[in-house]
């Protein structure tokens, strides 16, 4: 670790990588961050519980400023979940799993050593189930294996981590319940490497003649995000056309504004053109098939990685019990999420190198974006 990482000097920048899991509209405490003072307070409180006066003395800042900042960080955006918690003794402590650089690198290395085996196993699994993937009843006029695999890639990537999670739960953290909140954060001090990505979804109802529509998109190193959680689908001209074009849409029926939206929708991968017709390019399935949508890929966590996952779980459990405070052990799953972050990008690159997966040009396309509908 650098000197700054060990004990930051006031006004030196601390670069955190903080992820979220769940529904951020309930209250995302990351929205209260971004100030140098808050970054330093979080760092100090991640090492030990401290009072406002102790923090002020450590940072050479007025106690009044620190007290104001502490309340912001404790309350978060909804008054229920912040990055800090206030203890009974009046001190403040970190309220989410936050690894320092050295600990994050240790956690990542536990998974990194398993990546060659993970990639080999996933590749074999894909080849063995190719026809089954292609037989899924998508509603698109046409589809291909590449789009299907981009839809499935996170589930395939998570199979090893899910196996580790099961073993951690059964063997090391069996009596510890999940935290009872709709949204959680977890993170680490930037190690200089960028890993993984996310998955955002949006729902809308009674649009374009459909009862319910759910849209999802992933974003990773190779794929840029189309939209965020809670995106207003009904007001998105490109997505409305993608919804209308599932069974085909005659271009001649479109207004000039709709034709402009169509051109943009083709450019970003929502649609493709065949003669005078537009068709939806992102994968579309019936909501009635939701339970089956990832069913094939889910099988990968059933027995394919048991031996290797047991070794990983043992090492990770030791790290968690060493570096995570007892009151945060309910969040142990997020420590596992941090540890497993190198896997997704590594798997994607391995499959691209083998010609099994092809990324979209410039990072924007139909890849990694899909729609589930209820008529």
Predicted regions, residues:
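Basic, Lys/Arg-rich alpha-helical nucleic-acid-recognition elements, primarily the DNA-binding modules
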Residues: 1-2, 26, 31-56, 73
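Short alpha-helical segments that sit at the start of domains
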Residues: 8-40, 199-240
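Short capping segments at the starts of secondary-structure elements
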Residues: 47-54, 241-256
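Short amphipathic alpha-helical interaction segments
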Residues: 59-81, 253-268, 273
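Minor-groove-contacting beta-hairpin "wing" of winged helix-turn-helix DNA-binding domains
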Residues: 88-96, 276-284
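Short, amphipathic alpha-helical interaction segments positioned at domain boundaries
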Residues: 95-130, 284-319
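Extended alpha-helical scaffolding regions
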Residues: 108-221
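Phosphate/adenylate-binding glycine loop and adjacent helical scaffold
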Residues: 140-144, 266-269, 303, 307-335, ...
